[in-house]
Amino acid sequence: MFSDTRPVLAVLGTVGDLSQAAGPELIEGAPPDLPSPEECVRVVPSGTFPPPFMGHVDLRLHPDDAAFATGRQSGKPLMRGWFRLPEDEPADSLALLCAVDAFPPTAFNARLPIAWTPTVELTAHIRANPAPGWLRCRFSTRFVSSGFLEEDGEVWDSAGRLVGQSRQLALVPQG
């Protein structure tokens, strides 16, 4: 993608048939512990934030992680919550790609400025086709340095299986 003559987006994709994936498994993590979706804070677009596309998904933030919206950053660079398509439409691999980039930046809870956090690189791994129902998501940051931060994401399906992972490198928001 170009803006005038300047490249602003490059995409590389590798695709395969997940139904043919087989092999040993070792899972050292677990789905995030979340209150029910009804007890979480629904993200609804208004103005420029959250962005208008959020009206096309159902995203619910853990109450502890949603407090940034009222000026109470937790100090922990963490975002957890539920994700699904509208009207409980079944999620597919494209929905998983949307889920890994739909949550607010973890920087919003890190006592950094709440501002544009531009993505430099986003890598997403689709590990399995998700079971029907809500997806549990967790995004965390361990390192903020030299003007960059990384955000690692996990997406778990209603059967408790890891179905997606992501790593996003972003610029630290400037206030």
Q: What are these model-predicted stretches?
A:
Residues 1-175:
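Terminal targeting signals and extreme-terminal segments of soluble enzymes
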